[in-house]
Amino acid sequence: MPKTSDTEYLSFPILLGDIGGTNARFSILIDSFAEPVHLTTVKTAEYPGIDDAIQQAVLDKTSLQPVSTILAIAGPIEGDEIPLTNCHWVVKPKDMLAKLGLKDVIVINDFEAQALAIAALDDDNREPIGSGKKDMLASRVVLGPGTGLGVAGLVYARHMWFPVPGEGGHIDIGPRSARDYVVFPHIETIEGRVAGEQILCGRGLVNLYRAICKADGIEPVFSDPADITSQGLSGQNAQAKETLSLFSTYLGRVAGDLALIFMAKGGVYLAGGISQKIIPALKSPEFRAAFEDKAPHSALMRTIPTFVVTHPQAALSGLATYARTPADFGLALDGRRWRA
């Protein structure tokens, strides 16, 4: 892909939006030298649509009127009407151009934005898990347990970073250890298989906890991922503690598989709130042991660093990084950019 031409640069100010199923976060980037200014975070359920949220929560409350916008959304981007996953909003870029005074609208995948973020993430915004030394221009991977399991790669070629989104959250996870073979029969399946998102997300954390309880012959007492996490970290509940241990193991296995696929000597990054909350569990031996247990390539795996992304607004940071210097990225915009 050729470098971005001057005609593809966006005009400032640029509204940046990280649109999730529950929350929508907005920042504004005044120029290419500025840091993004966080404007607001809104609950998607409180607004009938994204245009209403932008108008009422952003435009009506700031004198900085954006000319362009880049939105990162959870869901496939196809056509001129883009429904969001786990949310009633539908993004209609042509309507945004007509109603909100914008001249340029770009819509990308939420984990493309996470991939853009890890291109320039500094030490203050990541927590190392285990050892390993990063190769600055080598491929990288980001995965994030959240509402689902997001996955993206970041590949350097032709003097540019190329984000590579996908549906890696739906890869198979299978049993390996003796304990796995006891627990896995009780994990909820999708058409007979256990996919990544059946375990490695908030809902999956609950699925795993319930499976452990069934394997132990006891009734589950928790139904909220936050309760399982807090009880597991404190060690006050044996099943919750094992849930975090197995969750870390399975996350390590999947992260290791993705590292091999991308030859991610630039590092594997764990994004999202769940990863941030369970850092103590991830620093226990299980995660790195599972990550490195990839014979015949265990020696290679020991050299690949792993991090938890601790930036509070990583997706917005990634969008800002791209907006400042789009020529540094091979971001495909066919069918994902609308202009007035």
From Swiss-Prot:
The reaction(s) this protein catalyses: D-glucose + ATP = D-glucose 6-phosphate + ADP + H(+)
GO MF entry, a single one: glucokinase activity
First-listed, main subcellular location of the protein, grouped into a coarse class: cytoplasm
Gene3D superfamilies reported in the protein's UniProt record: 3.30.420.40, 3.40.367.20
Coiled coil regions in record: none
Pfam families: Glucokinase
Keyword annotations of the record: ATP-binding, Cytoplasm, Glycolysis, Kinase, Nucleotide-binding, Transferase
Any one annotated GO CC term: cytosol
Keyword NAD carried by entry: no
GO biological process, one term: glycolytic process
Enzyme Commission no: 2.7.1.2
Protein's UniProt keywords contain ATP-binding: yes
Signal peptide range in chain numbering: none
Enzyme class: transferase
Subcellular location: Cytoplasm
Residues annotated to bind ATP: 17-22
PANTHER family assigned: GLUCOKINASE
Family: Belongs to the bacterial glucokinase family.
Record-given protein name: Glucokinase
Organism the protein comes from: Agrobacterium fabrum (strain C58 / ATCC 33970)
Record lineage: Bacteria, Pseudomonadati, Pseudomonadota, Alphaproteobacteria, Hyphomicrobiales
The gene coding this protein: glk
